[in-house]
Amino acid sequence: MSNQQSNSIPGWSLEERDPKFIESFMPIWEWFYRHYFRVRTDGWENVPTEDQVLVVGSHNGGMAVPDMIMMMYDWFRRYGTERLVYGLMHPHIWKINSDIAKLGEKTGAIAAHPKTANAALKRGASVLVYPGGQYDLFRPYNQRYNINF
């Protein structure tokens, strides 16, 4: 992915991520993580502490879509904000609500596309992906544990 290409398409730049911005939001995310959504995760002992990983999840929050940011909060509290991680976000967010998209970029969101994911991996970053996207958002509750590729 060329610099010209990454700068001309919203969500394609890996340069918008801001560790200081992330740190400033940690207390807010912690409250949502612990008290509102009451997130529980496990399996972190299987994540290498040094190497990059590809984390695959599924959306279960309906229109709220807290999954990605809560996962990123969990990542940051375990590994700090300096360990590179990017979350793939639906490219239409930049068209629908550019303000939310810009906030997402500061926390490490990039447009969901093979080229952006590949660029992040080449940089040595880990990547979070939710392959079911909008389909997972609106699936019936009894299918909440199914991941749609």
Q: What role is predicted for each listed range?
A:
Residues 106, 122, 130-131:
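Short glycine/serine/threonine-biased micro-segments
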Residues 1-115:
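Membrane-anchoring hydrophobic helices of lipid-metabolizing enzymes
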Residues 116-122:
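Short amphipathic alpha-helices and their capping/turn segments at secondary-structure boundaries
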Residues 126-149:
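Membrane-associated lipid acylation/remodeling enzymes share a hydrophobic transmembrane-juxtamembrane segment
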